């Protein structure tokens, strides 16, 4: 086409208007937050197995 060079046309990317300078593409999936569970409950259960009174002392010390 131009000076004997071949021109390659790419389809336009779909963008969502948002913060300037940061484009969000519809095609790319958004990263998701990893699933985390509250580990404090497990800690209390483990403490009760070792020493039932220790879990109560820990609860008082941490304010739970």
Swiss-Prot record:
Composition bias type Basic and acidic residues, residue spans: 22-64
Pfam families: UBact
Keywords: Isopeptide bond, Ubl conjugation pathway
Phosphoprotein in keyword set: no
InterPro entries on file: UBact
Region (Disordered): 1-64
Source organism superkingdom: Bacteria
Covalent link location (Isoglutamyl lysine isopeptide (Glu-Lys) (interchain with K-? in acceptor proteins)): 64
HAMAP family attached to this UniProt entry: UBact
Role of this protein: May function as a protein modifier covalently attached to lysine residues of substrate proteins. This may serve to target the modified proteins for degradation by proteasomes.
UniProt-recorded name of the protein: Prokaryotic ubiquitin-like protein UBact
Name of the gene encoding the protein in the UniProt record: ubact
